[in-house]
Amino acid sequence: MFAPLLKKLFGSKNEREVKRMLKTVSIVNAFEEKMVALSDEQLRGKTAEFKERLAKGETLDQLLPEAFAVAREAGKRVMGMRHFDVQLIGGMTLHEGMIAEMRTGEGKTLVGTLAVYLNALSGKGVHVVTVNDYLARRDANWMRPLYEFLGLSVGIVSAFQPPEEKRAAYAADITYGTNNEFGFDYLRDNMAFSQDEKFQRELNFAVIDEVDSILIDEARTPLIISGQAEDSSKLYIEINRLIPRLTQHIEEVEGQVTQEGHFTIDEKSRQVELNEAGHQFIEEMLAQAGLLAEGESLYSAHNLGLLTHVYAGLRAHKLFHRNVEYIVQDGQVLLIDEHTGRTMPGRRLSEGLHQAIEAKENLNIQAESQTLASTTFQNYFRLYTKLSGMTGTADTEAFEFQSIYGLNVMVIPPNKPLARKDYNDLVYLTADEKYAAIIADIKESMKLGRPVLVGTATIETSEHMSNLLKKEGIDHKVLNAKYHEKEAEIIAQAGAPGALTIATNMAGRGTDILLGGNWEAEVAALENPTAEQIAQIKADWQKRHQQVIETGGLHVIASERHESRRIDNQLRGRSGRQGDPGSSRFYLSLEDSLMRIFASDRVKNFMKALGMQSGEAIEHRMVTNAIEKAQRKVEGRNFDIRKQLLEYDDVANEQRKVIYHMRNSLLAAENIGDTIVEFRKEVLDATISQHIPPQSLPEQWDVAGLEASLASDFAIKLPIQQWLDEDDHLYEETLREKLLSEITTAYTEKEDQAGLDALRTFEKQILLRVLDDLWKDHLSTMDHLRHGIHLRGYAQKNPKQEYKRESFSLFQELLESIKRDTIRVLSHVQVRREDPAEEEARLRREAEELASRMQFQHAAAPGLESEQLSEEGAEVAVASAPVRNDQKLGRNEPCWCGSGKKFKHCHGQIE
């Protein structure tokens, strides 16, 4: 009740923040005259001066006004661009670790230079994160002259980069790269076998461009470095033949069955479930195909893997559609990002779903993989000391940014007021009526000579619209994931008079549609253009620009609402940049996915009450509200999925931190002899306690078992029974001391034979190898636990609490196994005095052989489904997998680990 009044009196939180920052803007502006008077050399010298002042105890906040003034003046001299006052506010927002929401065309890239320059002065490095390699290179090369003028170095990281080049890029003051590459390099660093192999420094400050895309849309995608597992391609092919014989079970809303079948589909949660008839039918078919023994159930423990394959096949056929969720290109299934409309090369669906789609499309089925290292973007980016971001659409997700990342959203005022007109949605009964109305709207705009952008949610819809326009004889361009190579060319001229562009969400982000077309693209198309040619192109563009403005600017037509309001706002944002005129209109029908699944009943009843006829549309605020309510419902569900993913990954993340800290300490240590001594004592104590319970009577001791365990774990045969027979005073405590002494003596002899330095190096390599192998299998076990844990709910237990409890128990076992297996390998290695180089090489070779022979296996069955809120067949971003093959690698061939080094300079050193 009092909230509106208080807001009127004191302003919103955002307005108060802007007011606070405007005071600092005044101080920055006061420096401008002084900066203009400096020579280039003096202006450049300011960077060294700032670094010196930092070293003497000043803070970045104290330097901010003068540093921003320096960056602004450098921008004028080098780029010919001066930061507006609102851009200074954006720079302060980023420096303070917040998200700056800025409209299209407000110069986000230029805003970033302010915070990046200031924070790079600390010498700890700044990462500028983009959504793809193209944008990373474009922005880095665009801003490089500015940073280098100010005496700062710039690096770019990318996939398949030579290690030396990548290391230099990370050592630079400012490093550009994609979210995927930064995340994968973090994982690779934690698989390195020496400090020299690592790339990244301390994670200091990151500025994320299109922050909502990376921290929200990508949050459900785990980053996984994987190696190959067993080949199950034949099974996928067999299952794929059976799936089409299953039919869908359909019920009306009133519960009346209209079609008996074997499975049901829940479009809201994207789930497909076999019913009782379906289970019986598929079991019969599997038995006939020889995949299931006669009379056996799919739910038998040893058949759960088969059931997973059946569900993967069902989802592939019933939930994933070609040209909607994926396309087939060059014999591969390429997933389409629902938020950007772009393909995602290198990304695969998990739980066998990607292989099932490959089988459905009759493609070569790639082998399944085993996780070697993994994390999520949520947990990776929370490792940075300070995090900030920029986007055109963040305010709708402000709660999620705050609750998960601790990031506040600041809406930056535009430099010029928005002149775009956003019309109410038009809702039709059928899709055909909707498309007819869109064609009519296009024709009307084309008569005026206005450029038109038609946004579609899928490739399928964009191609359908294209076919309709061809029938009408209307010239147009199509931009979707199939024709992405023409993207720059199409977007460059999408604002020309009378231009018509049909595009998926690709046109919604990272693009700037200039009214009248892009004159710079025209100049770039010429070979060695003269000054006269450039002047003529500019003059022609100015005429076209004015012509488009007079006709009303770019008209954006959307063929349906997206699940997320952000994506809709991004599409609208293509029009009306920097105060230009423009308009937008959404056309919907009751047959659209969002309307059909989430909003149709209420709207359909409302339309019936109005007595709507074919071809009529409804334009009413109630309908728009109902649609936005449906969108909020979907957004809320997706937020719950991301939050749940984070809650589960937080458990794994704490374990990841412990293992990676242990690993980094190992790499940094010159000598781990004391660690091995400690391990040996702990393993021996545990082994003895297993056979001689503390404070037990000698009659309860399992002496034979202890002798066997010592022979197995420590490679030493000791006559313990004989000692006990000969010495009546050999009690438990004295026996422990005697055994430790004997084992230590045996290992000391090994040190003397091998040479202390060689054995110390060998110990480190063995411990790293054992840790990596056991961690890999632990990840696999955790994955299986995660996918099956929801079943505990049927036993009235909290799945999350059960997951935490069991994962903690598994982690304790992992830590004990690392100690035990390390000691076992070291104890079994036989050494003799050799030439030092040969000796070290042989020791490492034996270590490799022993470690590879050890079976670090966990008995586990793949889970059936994740919890109701979790995403079925979640995507995983897969790095160039460090696949370890059995065949011998040549010394000059690339190493199997994916580091980019030659084998002889990488893992070949320890083999």
From Swiss-Prot:
Question: Primary place of residence?
Answer: membrane
| Gene Ontology terms, MF aspect | ATP binding; metal ion binding; protein-exporting ATPase activity
One GO biological process this protein is involved in is: protein transport by the Sec complex
Q: Give the cofactor note text.
A: May bind 1 zinc ion per subunit.
Q: Does the keyword Zinc belong to this entry?
A: yes
Q: Which UniProt keywords apply?
A: ATP-binding, Cell inner membrane, Cell membrane, Cytoplasm, Membrane, Metal-binding, Nucleotide-binding, Protein transport, Translocase, Translocation, Transport, Zinc
Q: What class of enzyme is it?
A: translocase
Subcellular location(s) of the protein: Cell inner membrane; Cytoplasm
Membrane protein topology class: Peripheral membrane protein
Q: Record's Gene Ontology CC terms?
A: cell envelope Sec protein transport complex; cytosol; plasma membrane
Q: Could you tell me which InterPro entries the record lists for this protein?
A: Helicase_ATP-bd (IPR014001), Helicase_C-like (IPR001650), P-loop_NTPase (IPR027417), SEC_C_motif (IPR004027), SecA (IPR000185), SecA_DEAD (IPR011115), SecA_motor_DEAD (IPR014018), SecA_preprotein_X-link_dom (IPR011130)
Q: What is its EC number?
A: 7.4.2.8
Q: Which cofactor does it need?
A: Zn(2+)
Q: Give yes or no: UniProt keyword Ribonucleoprotein.
A: no
Pfam families (UniProt xref): P-loop_SecA, SEC-C, SecA_DEAD, SecA_PP_bind, SecA_SW
Catalysed transformations (reactions):
ATP + H2O + cellular proteinSide 1 = ADP + phosphate + cellular proteinSide 2
Positions of region (Disordered): 861-893
Physiological role:
Part of the Sec protein translocase complex. Interacts with the SecYEG preprotein conducting channel. Has a central role in coupling the hydrolysis of ATP to the transfer of proteins into and across the cell membrane, serving both as a receptor for the preprotein-SecB complex and as an ATP-driven molecular motor driving the stepwise translocation of polypeptide chains across the membrane.
Cite the record's note on assembly.
Answer: Monomer and homodimer. Part of the essential Sec protein translocation apparatus which comprises SecA, SecYEG and auxiliary proteins SecDF-YajC and YidC.
Q: Which family does it belong to?
A: Belongs to the SecA family.
- What HAMAP family does this protein's entry cite? SecA
Protein name, UniProt field: Protein translocase subunit SecA
Upper lineage: Bacteria, Pseudomonadati, Pseudomonadota, Gammaproteobacteria, Pseudomonadales
Gene this chain is encoded by = secA
